[in-house]
């Protein structure tokens, strides 16, 4: 963790980091397990895996907060971009080299493919951060098509309305309409 906390440099800090990692991993495993249970016709078991996964998510959040891991949106976007940068520039490349050295060429290739995805994630977070920092999330210098994420109302203009005229949801529900079909 990059931020300084009252735990910085202590064994307790290491324990908090381990608790966060463990709870985060457990959450993911339980969602994967729920999917298998559901496919095999065990709805109750799937539901219990998901409920437990939600509990684990909250436990992880509690420990992450102790580590000052959650900031405002701009801080979170920067932290996310930096994390993605580390993943694609260092982590996955190192993993790929090790896999190649050990003869796992297919896995090395997969590590590099995922690294390319992580690069895209970094670019996306940095673009969103620029929008937040320049107050261009809901306002642009050129005409855009804005869509309400709640009801689908379309507005054409340089900025999203303060309130959706159809469903009365706030501006925060608007995004630039994406046509990908």
Name these PLM-found stretches.
Residues 1-181:
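Non-heme di-metal
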